[in-house]
Amino acid sequence: MADDLDFETGDAGASATFPMQCSALRKNGFVVLKGRPCKIVEMSTSKTGKHGHAKVHLVGIDIFTGKKYEDICPSTHNMDVPNIKRNDFQLIGIQDGYLSLLQDSGEVREDLRLPEGDLGKEIEQKYDCGEEILITVLSAMTEEAAVAIKAMAK
């Protein structure tokens, strides 16, 4: 019975987001804006008006696409904050635009797409030169993407 439970993944059925009061959010923190996980790049608060609450104006950049999103909410309301995980995997191959990554468990993942743009070119270039590199993978709200690379410690 206990053999079919998987505790390795670490989320244990946890929600992809958790609530946080608007006034507790901070710049460089994370928040869900328009259904997308974003990093807060700008935040301003307006004073309490004649009717209602103080408002918080949030500007965030999507952590996967880089698109800019804005939202305004009362400071007392709750906003969703994405659960974000960063993992480093060793790059062992690139095939058909997908990365082959070695996990800590020894298993190989081949479901992550090579990022587009400069990062993708840099990964290919270092791989072609035979450098051993680690790929930093960011995962939030059922999405995953390679966001950074670093040389492996010898």
Swiss-Prot record:
It comes from the Eukaryota. GO terms for biological process: cellular response to virus; positive regulation of intrinsic apoptotic signaling pathway by p53 class mediator; positive regulation of transcription by RNA polymerase II; positive regulation of translational elongation; positive regulation of translational termination; translational elongation; tumor necrosis factor-mediated signaling pathway. SMART domains: eIF-5a. Changing E122K: In FABAS; in yeast, exhibits reduced ribosome binding and cells show impaired synthesis of proteins containing poly-proline tracts. Expressed in umbilical vein endothelial cells and several cancer cell lines (at protein level). Residues 20-90 are annotated as: Interaction with DOHH. It is linked to Faundes-Banka syndrome: An autosomal dominant disorder characterized by variable combinations of developmental delay, microcephaly, micrognathia and dysmorphic features. This is Eukaryotic translation initiation factor 5A-1.
